[in-house]
Amino acid sequence: MEKFNVHTGVVAPLDRENVDTDAIIPKQFLKSIKRTGFGPNAFDEWRYLDHGEPGQDNSKRPLNPDFVLNQPRYQGASVLLARKNFGCGSSREHAPWALQQYGFRAIVAPSFADIFFNNCYKNGLLPIVLTEQQVDHLFNDTYAFNGYQLTIDLDAQVVRAPDGREYPFEITAFRKYCLLNGFDDIGLTLRHADKIRQFEAERLAKQPWLDNRLVG
């Protein structure tokens, strides 16, 4: 998992409440057995004018010019600004996969659905909760200035705006540690690989029948 320390990026404003996971990545794309390739289909039903299916050449599909991610001023955005209850709906982990593979490193919103919120951390995507008033202010600035950028300093736990304003945010020490070091669940486990191997060797010597094999 990619480490997250300080990130500065263009902000894309998704000015809708209750954006659910089916809007983030529609159900037909969940058939894939891979964890990659979801970025081109993030927000598929809003992003394109036709109906998307797995395996299509998305470069030939007609874009919806009114959708925020298709507007030139927000191209290359890596910070998503959203409204309350972002990521509600079914608990598909494909949703943070799609957002991350689109290019987003962080999402700023007044609130998130719990399961989506947790899935973001597990995949290196930083969900930041600010107050509705703070989010309103950021929406206004994003609309007012082309190429509006935010700097997210995870170590300091603050979002910095170009006008000098700072917006502190909360994160647990464990989640912060994992993101700063690029550890997902597997990475955390592998840090103890030597101890795991030692335990398994000792267990096998004492209880070989559990592995249905003999030690000799």
From Swiss-Prot:
The encoding gene: leuD
Enzyme class, spelled out: lyase
EC annotation from Swiss-Prot or TrEMBL: 4.2.1.33
Stated family: Belongs to the LeuD family. LeuD type 1 subfamily.
Top-level division of the source organism's lineage: Bacteria
InterPro entries, A to Z: 3-IsopropMal_deHydase_ssu, Aconitase/3IPM_dehydase_swvl, AconitaseA/IPMdHydase_ssu_swvl, IPMI_Swivel, LeuD
Cited Pfam families: Aconitase_C (PF00694)
Upper taxonomic lineage: Bacteria, Pseudomonadati, Pseudomonadota, Betaproteobacteria, Burkholderiales
Organism: Burkholderia mallei (strain ATCC 23344)
Protein name (record): 3-isopropylmalate dehydratase small subunit
Disulfide bonding pattern of the chain: none
Catalysed reaction equations from the record: (2R,3S)-3-isopropylmalate = (2S)-2-isopropylmalate
